[in-house]
Amino acid sequence: ASFSIEGIPFVFTNSAMGCLVDVDVDTGLTKIEKFWAVEDCGTQINPKLVEEQIRGGVVQGIGGALYEECIYDEMGNLTNGNMADYLVPMAYEMPDIIVDHVTTNSGRSILGAKGAGEAGTGGAPGAIMNAINDALISLNTEVTSQPITPEKVLKALGKI
C-alpha cells in the first residue's frame, strides 16, 4: 500500500485566546495572571497530550510576546546568544493556562483531526499585547512592538 499527500491539504487548528494581565506602571513589568485558550483541534486522538501541546504553544507565545529577542551590535554580532542573556519564560512566571476545546471534525483528514498547539505561538502574543494595551488605555498610551519589555512599557508611559 502507498500513500501520497497530493491533493490533501494541511488542516490547521482554529483558536481564540485571551488573558488577564497586571501591568506595574512604576517598573514596567507585566504579569500574566490568567490565560485562556480555546482550540478546535478536531478529533483528539490523545486528549491529555493535546492539552499539554496547547499549553506548550501558549508558553512559546508568551516568550515571543514578553521576552525573546535577538539583539545585535553595530557590527552585526549577536550579543545575547547564550541562555544567560537570551530571555525565555521561566516556570514561576507561567500563569494558570485554562484550556478548553471546540470540536468540529475536519472532513479533510482521515481521522477528523486538525493541528494542535501551534495556535498558541501566534495567538498568545496578540492576546497579551491586547491585554497590556487594554490595561494602559486609561493612561492614553500603548505599546506597539514585541517583545513587550519593561523598558518599552516605561517608554510608552513617558517615564524614560
Where in the sequence are the language-model features?
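Cofactor-binding beta-sheet edge motifs in enzyme active sites
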Residues: 1-160
